[in-house]
Curated annotation (Swiss-Prot):
It is found in: Cytoplasm. It catalyses: tRNA(Pro) + L-proline + ATP = L-prolyl-tRNA(Pro) + AMP + diphosphate. Consists of three domains: the N-terminal catalytic domain, the editing domain and the C-terminal anticodon-binding domain. This is Proline--tRNA ligase. The gene is proS.
Amino acid sequence: MRLSQMLFVTLREDPAEAEIPSHKLLLRAGYIRRIASGIYAYLPLMWRVLRKVSQIVREEMDATGAQETLLPQLQPAELWQESGRWETYTKAEGIMFSLDDRQQRQLGLGPTHEEVITAVARDLIRSYRQLPQNLYQIQTKFRDEIRPRFGLMRGREFIMKDAYSFHADEESLRQTYAAMDQAYRNIFRRCGLQFRAVEADSGAIGGSASQEFMILADAGEDEILYTEDGRYAANVEKAVSLPAEAIASAFTTFEKRETPGTDTIASLCEFLKADPTQVVKQVLYQAVFDNGKLLPILISIRGDQSVNEIKLTNELTRRAADYGAKTVIALTVPDAEALKKWTAAPLPLGYLGPDLADSAIAVNESIIPKFLRLVDPTAAELQNFVTGANEVNFHVVGANWETNFPKPAVVDLRTALVGDRAQHDSSQVLASARGIEAGHIFQLGLKYSQAMGATFTTENGTEEPLWMGCYGIGVSRVAQAAVEQSYDKDGIIWPVAIAPYQAVVVIPNITDTEQVAAAEKIYADLTAAGIETLLDDRDERAGVKFKDADLIGIPYRIVTGRSLKEGKVEVVQRASKESSVIAVGSVVETVQDWIAAAIV
């Protein structure tokens, strides 16, 4: 391709809208163009990158026996209502674009396709003889992000590969899940990316197990906690660990004490000369279910720990049926205004105890009249602890569960921290890294098939629900994440496997007929050898061309400059900036060798 004929415009300054390096560089280098908030045009160079990523994904999926398909982007609300996710996606999380057609039928623009594919399987899969099946697609998805940011990282429109598998039993599901795990590792390696597979929360997708694939980058939105022995890695939302040991309490007698002005852990510990690990603090939450009911929640947790709201949301979702609901649509720490709406009288905030009476809740048919009481293991194991007395300026010391307070249901709700000990080996401590979630695989189990009545006939003639898995990769996110992982002050450094072109031939002086002729010959020879090559034949200064070549990140640059008089050209490797002068006749072989060494 000749740059003189390409729609190719670069920018010298960083666009004001861009926050992270990869977003700045993709805009500056002419890969993408912003159309609206979270919506981008993929320009010719970017489209080549996306096609390459898609092809690697396609090849690895096909190698597992998965079958490519294409599902509708417009999805009827009825399917999502069957699964119970319509309210979650259109109201609670609010991430689905929804609309009414001219017959006033509700539709959604698909952020994901579990419901559609389950409906297809329900209609077409009848017998165990048809199982297992694994179907995938690569297409545009939509999410109504509250705050689109970081370019293609968190957009409202994006390209994704999603696959869905169907099985007769859980063992078959596990086998496909393992195959997808390996396929994803192959994909990211072939794309030339550094990544880490981590345990993950299943979120609104649901299911019994899931794993994320994180592309390591300082600008990653996700925090990963891992051990140096390589045996544990998890998203902080999912991570578990052993916290620091609690210091033994000096309070051996249960008594109420006046503790004026101690409504924080720090002030309380200073007043009592105690350690935060000896304190049980109460954290108030309120949850709203999809049936409109508000549930007051009282969490007891050790004083030096914090509540992981993802873990709490998951626990509430598991308990939703106990309150006549299907899901949680909001979880918040109530502020003063919110408390006025459901408390019978002002609460002694900062002095709450585990036995805060249910009578503190106002009588209202939309409010569940009893606290959901949960205790984190860090607090459940404490003895002779300090906690609130449910009275302003008073605490109790020397308290014990069951003796002084009923012990609530014990649930892991704490946020794991850097420096915590690992559960698999207490000599290992958790370290932290930032990552960009680029892939996610789930064992969905029976969640969707049971909800939507997708069954098959077993070998014994009985009707059973299908076991399901789903497996996603953000194709457009992978492309930008590659830039976030590999760039320098001069521009992008593409991995060779997904670079839009593998080589660029630069003519420093377009009026020099010898330079032009040599460049044309090299360009033709490289192209004939199957090397994807750009020819920079623009009428621009040499310095502009060199800066643009660095900016757009083509792996190998060939310059037909002054060395031509000796029958040689300069070749530059973008990643290392290593430059050498070689014979014109050696260019094709040299570039071929570099490409072969770079591509896994």
